[in-house]
């Protein structure tokens, strides 16, 4: 086999005399050499245009490859070699042996079988989507394989984009289904190593893993040199190289394009990751250079030098949370160029919403000669005021900051000795100039961004590239694209769909972009909760207290809970404190199977642009279907044109209450609330009367049709805003049709109540009432 020497790369490395290949790895790492062979196996399968004939899919080479590995002497190699048009070795799971190197020769591919049964840990456990759990063997496994290796200029293709035998889905289809459904996919990883001291990967090309490409655990001494990983960016959970609980790791001269972390350090409670060098590499699509999300074993003495990241979702990232955190320190990123990256720099101990006592602490983090050439989101977060992020920015430049987002809090940032233009400010962020600081100069990056290297000697078999999924996925456990809904909204484009996994998201949302959808695939809306505890008193008034504020048009929400729990978190304050769950002033908004929880002033549905005297109001329309709204005083209020279809309206404990406080200002305003086929329920044991509404403005308009009313509804139904002081009830339009239940007492209703005829009811059907000049009919909207 011809052995190339990477002469040009080594010459380039001389430019970086500050980092020999000792670096943080305590070993002296030199370019590997392929061992002599104990046996050479020849391929028996052809694959014209990358397609293996169905008959050949049964002709596995697993047994002969495994026999060769089992019988090869330590220090030697099993070589897989093509012969003529036959260049494919087809295999199920393989087990490496100590001291033995598997070599895939140039123009040869070691291909994974598409039969999921070969990878079962238990019968039927692999190739499925289900609850959390792992059900697959890796394609290549090594435990106790000291001084072994995987080398060669050929490729290992795990065929993540090929349909499974007997099925119509690919491995990657399963991964996408799991992401959408917030489930776990059981798919095989490509290479899994444990206790693999002195293991080396050299020149090999890895393609299309269904799961992680390389994971290394409990190992002292691992080298990946000249490795190429090429997997589509749309293939979920396909990490490149993941060192976990290991030390003395070098990843050098490698090129990685994948659908998840390009390189990710993953310590766990067993041990940390230390003494690692990532040198002279190029990352393309993926999630960048990451540490975490578990850091409870600790990370120290990491050097990342001469790295380009082009087109990834993330750049340099440390991520963890208090449920699995630990100390990350003595980490240096030097001579790094980043462009076309959504999140160029991310340092967060709040990667998920999980709580715990394993605190993620980041200190002695150094960025030296780092240049970010395009806008993105920058995150510099400490855990809290007592556990700040400690980071030094030495000659760090970020272009186009005016179009970037910054999330900075609880950080101690040192600038220099070379001053760049990045100095993140924020709440409880201190910035200190290093002694002797001088103006810096941006790192020159043009020559550092290079095309992905040629894969001419590394064949690829046919498969389907997963389509681009433009949805944004939010998961409280960190398995999505974001752990925060608002962070997703910050980067969302008009028309995007935000898929929120079950969990509790304690935050405040502002939706100011058109055509946004927020939904969960779990039909139990109580499982996906967006909650906060803002109040009118603490936030400048009722209309500034909302957990969710929607000002943009064409908003859609489904299968979620929107809650303001101010009274629960402040039990010492009066129960009547005004605290909104939702404020909606956007037009053509739809809420389906959404729970709105609060007490006083739960849901504000209003028009916009009104002057103080109620003039110039721009009407807005909202449609609420199959939803649940809880509160006690004026908990559905405002002056929009809103329709509540098949909703449950729940009155919570309070000394009296009012469901609506509609606020139509004048007879000409296009405004009113309609409730149709709803149920009016109440907390058990509540005896105080509840009214259907009172008029916040003189021309309040509310209609209840076909509604089942509990006994808590006062027989009068409606009441003046302040009896004896205000006189709006004389000009309101309060109406009912076909009310049922013990609360429906037409003969005792306030005399201002109108009782509709069947003919009059027609004008209050949603397709008529909400039509507007654009003929909007929310009941005919396509299923989201």
What spans do the regions from the language model cover?
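Glycine-rich repeat segments that build the extracellular carbohydrate-interaction surface of secreted
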Residues: 54, 66-91, 96, 100-113, ...
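Right-handed parallel beta-helix
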Residues: 93, 147-282, 506, 554-650
